[in-house]
Every structure is written in C-alpha cells, then in structure tokens.
Amino acid sequence: MKPPHADAETSFPPLFPSPPPSPSPLPPPFPPPFPLYEEEFAADPHSAYARMRADHGPLVPVELAPGVPATLVIGYAEALHILRDEYRFPADPRVWQRTVPDSCPVKPMMEWRPNAIRSQGAEHTRYRAANTAAIDAVDEHKLHDLVERISHRAIAGFRPAGQADLLVDFAWPLTFQVLSDLLGCPDSIGHRIADGMNKLFDGGEIAIRGNVILNQAVADLVAVKRNRPGYDITSRLIAHSARLDDTEMSHQIVTLYGAGIEPVVNLITNTLVRLLTDVEFSGDVHAGDASVREALDFVLYRDPPLANFCFAYPPHPVNLGGYLLPAHQPVVISMAGCNNDPALGDPQNASGNRAHLAWSAGPHACPARSQAYLIAESAITYLLDALPEMELACAPQDLTWRPGPFHRAIAHLPVVFPRVDQ
C-alpha cells in the first residue's frame, strides 16, 4: 500500500523531520548480586530472602564480601540435592582460594583446612571418624550437670544487679566454659581461642587477625594435651587410630570451637529472644504447655544460628534445575533461606518440626547436634527457672543484629528482673 502522498505531483519534505522509530524496549536489568555483608541484611534477613526468591528463584547471585561472588541456595530441595552430592559439589575450596587475595575478609572463614568440613572421600572419612568418636564419648548426664553448675555461677554473678546482658553475661561465658571443659582447655588458652573465633565470624579485616590468634592458641592447646592427656575430647582425638599430626589436630580443634561457641551462643540467645518477645509462647513454656525444646526447634527452623554456612565448590560448571553454577565458585547453603522456603509451608507453624537444615544434611551433617541441643536446653531451662520474672529491657524493635554473611547473631540482649541479694 502506498502512502497517501505518493501520487502527488509535488511533495515537500516536512518542516520538522519525523523522529526515528523507537528502539525495541530493553529487557529489565538483571538484579545485581545481593550483598550479604551489609547491616541492612542483618537487620531483616527474611525480607531479603523474600526479595531474592522473587528476583532469582532458589539460586541467588550474592556477594559474601565486596568483590567475592557466590551462589546462595535458598531452595530446600536444591539444598538437599547439593548437600548429598559430594561428587558434583565437593567441599574443598583450594582452587577457589588461589583466586582470592589474603586480604579477603571472608577467606579465613572459608579457606581449606585439613578437617572433615573442608575435605571429601577418604580424608573426610578419616577426620569425621576421629571427631565422631571423641564427641560420642561425652557423658551427657555429666554434661547436663556441668551446664547447670556453670549456669548457676553465671546467674549468681549478675542477679544482685537486677539487670544483665544475656549475651555477654550468660550465653557466651557459659558456652565458652562448657566447651573448654569438654576439650580439656586451660582458661588462659581458651580465652585466646574465643577471641580469635569471635573475630573470625565477624568477618571484615578483623577476621584476618582473628585467624592468627586462633591458630596459635589451638597449637598451644595441642602441645599441652600431648604432654598431659586427660579424659577430654582433645586427648581422645590425639589417641584415635587416625593418628592425627599436630597440624591436623590444630584444625580439628578449630573446627570444634567454631561449631561449639558461636552457633551454640546464637542458638541460646535467639531462643531467648523469642521467649522474651513472644508473650503467648513464653507463657505456654512457663505453664508447661510448651517446652524449651520446642522453642529451640522453632529457632533452628526460623532463625538458625548459622544462617548461611555450608560451602561447596563445583569442579565443573553444573546445570541445576536450569541454573548454571560456575566452576570453582562458592555455592553457599542458606539454612535460614531454605528452612523458610514457601514450598515447606508457613515457618510460623514450625514449632516442633525438626526437618530443618540448621544441622546441615548428608555426609557433612553436624556430628554434635545432641550435645548442642543439651547445652542450649539445659542452660535456658535453668535460666527461666532462676529468673521467672525476667523481661526484655528494651523494645523488641530496638534489638540489633551483628552484620556478617554467615551468622544470625544478636548484638546485645538486655533484660531486667527483680534484684535478689546473694
């Protein structure tokens, strides 16, 4: 078809040329990697997981630190697939870490160590067997009594004041002392180990210094226990048929402290946050209609103490459900994101549900979950019995959370209660 003026004898160009045709609309920009290290993420991670899911689905591009890309897994089914497949998703980070400068703030937390968490195959079996044997020999009746004794001492120290920070005054010193006793660690060495672990979990530049402190302290502990063995986890590791050398021993201790201090402290405090802010549930616990164990399971499901932690490094690009995972780039399981996958139902109704990933799954599942449960449950039960009128000393919205890509950790937990002179 001709344009209307095509047959005219004379045609003049328009006074103003027509604009060129509009280009086809560009596709919306792909959302940038989500930074897990910022305070905004720590303040409201569940909203962040919801945005990630809406933008990306179950596999999300993230940054663990500025310029450190990774894939965060927030789909429950996808996480189980990865955790159970050691061949396509090994835990050994050595190829990746060669591409990361020593100044990288998350490198100390993620780098290779000769332990069960960062190994596979025969070496993983060897390390895990030694650790499992040493942990399984813990007498849980004696452990319960130990937790109660240390709880009593901690509460006696702050009870006359009528106020306390349950993180600084209760959960942290209790967990530290219990673990040090189980490992046969002298206080002078244990305090250095705890300082190093705290710095390591916080990430940032301070993590590098924390790694140095930690490595020297655990080396000193191994030397002490080789010379003076006792009935403790460290001595049992030394005596195990795996015949761990000093370097391997040091890394087993680092692993045990890493899995024993920060996660258990966070489990205790996160559970206390729920009991102090959920009046109805707290009332049920005090009345005996709900148990501390149910509160622990709710927190492990909703706000696990290590929110994003299990790492895998595919040796080749992997297509998982239509998502291409790059070779030798971290794949991080978000226990918090996976537990709150809408495919599992409403997480608010998760009380008593133990199908969560807080303890991981597959060959790298936590070997000390029974002991961790016992420590947290015994400590919280003793505290609630000792201070039944305890209340939060601030508005719930004023509680703040420590930033960091790996943990779900309260910064402070202030409470008040009637003063009682000793």
Where does each model-flagged region fall?
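Cytochrome P450
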Residues: 181-188, 271-285, 338-344, 389, ...
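Cytochrome P450 catalytic-core helices
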Residues: 250-255, 261-286, 370-387
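Cytochrome P450 heme-thiolate "Cys pocket" and heme-binding signature region
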Residues: 346-413, 422
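A translation/RNA-centric and nucleic-acid-associated enzymatic feature enriched
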Residues: 308, 321-322, 327-343
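Short, conserved phosphate/pyrophosphate- and ester-handling motifs at nucleotide-, phospho-/glycolipid
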Residues: 75, 260, 328, 376
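Conserved cytochrome P450 K-helix E-x-x-R motif and the immediately C-terminal K′/meander segment
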Residues: 286-323
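Active-site substrate-recognition loop segments, prototypically the cytochrome P450 B′-helix/B-C loop
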Residues: 2-19, 23-167, 176-194, 198-200, ...
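Cytochrome P450 catalytic core segment centered on helix I
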Residues: 183, 192-247
